[in-house]
């Protein structure tokens, strides 16, 4: 009855003495399975202790899978699982008939008399199932590596294998059950106490922007934040500013609290790492990007540039500019970075360039898979994830260009999965394209409006699951792609 041999060439080991191939046996413990099932049939309450981590597919024997599954179904209905109730459910099953099921169930009951701690048997069954899955993954990795198809690169195969192994390793960690309320209460009080000690009341990672921190209270672990805007609004520039500020602020906090330095991860699916770092250098050294690209720099500017370059090089700031990554690849690389570099916050530019895994022809379904995947990364790694997003062209057709939640591309699922949705909007961009002719009566009115929004970027917090929404005006220097706190100013109509 037991499946104790693998009849294929992939699982054959050589006997070193006789040089005779010996079929390898998959790891299993049929007796442990029998004794556990018998114990549960004797006392159904034992099921609650093992069902938190043990599923029917963890059993090696197909008949044991069916018996365990039947026990779960019977008890879910509020009935008692006994050999009699099981027999009525499985009587038409061919495998049950083949092994003379009634006698077999009686045998299980007899074997249960020797069980001392059934939970230990459940753990043995679970551990052996993990080992069998590990063998399956190993075979899959070998078979994929033998596949010489040019459609799948070796790098993709490695990431696929790494993801499979990580999922297998973390499977037991994700089997969460009810937690007594005292534990999360203690965690909440600890968080509140930390907030009370902070004069700025920022309990997450500071954005480096006072008014934005007052609205968001910093970036919080396990949150998914969406930063959306139309082209030329400054999405990437703003994300770079936030990433650099977060990197510096995490470092200071880690040093103060005597903790391991956390790092920033930045997936740049659109721009190359060179383009991204050129923007960083322009922002920090306050040298326009045209001068940097053309190399037209005086000695003073060049020295300033070298100084900022040296400072930036020391930061725990990591960029991955691989194009068209799948959500699975992003998850794998983020996990690796968390493990190797203590990832503290993750930025992704931008959401619509990520590929789904299921290859759905429905783009809304694919975006749903991606946003759910990003939220899962935030929760699993316990970090904030900030993903940039495009907005629908419908914005340009309205008189009022301020974005709304309904303007998100494939909006329903993005809005639903995000903890915070922010829009970046610069009225200056639109006004400069509506300048009346010089001498026109409306020119003075236009100039007055432009003065009031000059160098201002509005960050519109449209959704905030745990806080207020509203508008946060910031200073924006388009020459250096630099954001800062906005000083309160008065404007003259002259």
UniProtKB/Swiss-Prot annotation:
Biological process per Gene Ontology, one example term: DNA replication, synthesis of primer
One cellular component term from this protein's GO annotations in UniProt: primosome complex
Listed GO MF terms: ATP binding; ATP hydrolysis activity; DNA binding; DNA helicase activity
Domain SF4 helicase: 198-490
Catalytic activity: Couples ATP hydrolysis with the unwinding of duplex DNA at the replication fork by translocating in the 5'-3' direction. This creates two antiparallel DNA single strands (ssDNA). The leading ssDNA polymer is the template for DNA polymerase III holoenzyme which synthesizes a continuous strand; ATP + H2O = ADP + phosphate + H(+)
Residues annotated as binding ATP: 229-236
One Pfam family matching this protein: DnaB
Keywords: ATP-binding, DNA replication, DNA-binding, Helicase, Hydrolase, Isomerase, Nucleotide-binding, Primosome
Documented EC number(s): 5.6.2.3
Superkingdom: Bacteria
Free-text function comment from the UniProt entry: The main replicative DNA helicase, it participates in initiation and elongation during chromosome replication. Travels ahead of the DNA replisome, separating dsDNA into templates for DNA synthesis. A processive ATP-dependent 5'-3' DNA helicase it has DNA-dependent ATPase activity.
NCBIfam families membership: DnaB (TIGR00665), PRK09165.1 (NF006606)
PANTHER family in the cross-refs: REPLICATIVE DNA HELICASE (PTHR30153:SF2), REPLICATIVE DNA HELICASE DNAB (PTHR30153)
Family per record: Belongs to the helicase family. DnaB subfamily.
Subunit record text: Homohexamer.
Name of this chain's protein: Replicative DNA helicase DnaB
Gene name per UniProt: dnaB
